[in-house]
């Protein structure tokens, strides 16, 4: 999972840098470019696929804007846009469902977007930092399959009980991968 546009590189130049290190496929969530450029940014990322030396699988950003009424964005994606884009080549699912409060409150906009993804039977990626217990269960009941925002050992073990795919990451802002892997291995059945 990556946001190529956050590297400030075009998909081609990004590929030129990562392919020599063995990265041949990335799961691109075009969230940033979609929030700034709207549908044109999304089209750009899709169209770049045939011209780069790696495979770029895309998830269509679920939250444009990230959280309605809380921030301004260059675009607003209506649920009808997903009907078309979730069927495009190289598209494998719906990107980070960040508006977890909207999901939990059955907000009409995010509910319709999730319904489109479920109707298309695509992967739905979660983004639910620190969501636990009944709130996590309610979030997952909407077809969300993973969370790439899990940050702590306690959080990871509680998520496992909910049958949630956990994306463990090591990034410049998050260096706890060894601790999380150790804690998860103690749970067993991994």
Where are these regions (language model features)?
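Short N-terminal helix-initiation segments at or just after the protein's N-terminus
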Residues: 1-5, 58-65, 129-130, 137
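Divalent-metal coordination cores built from histidine and acidic residues
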Residues: 15-123, 188
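Histidine/acidic residue-rich metal-binding segments in metalloenzymes
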Residues: 76-96, 102-168, 172-190
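Di-metal (Zn2+ and/or Mg2+/Mn2+) metal-binding site signature of metallo-dependent hydrolases
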Residues: 1-15
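Acidic-and-aromatic substrate-binding clefts and catalytic sites of carbohydrate-active enzymes
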Residues: 7-9, 34-37, 173-174
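Histidine (H) residue identity feature
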Residues: 1-3, 21, 31, 127, ...
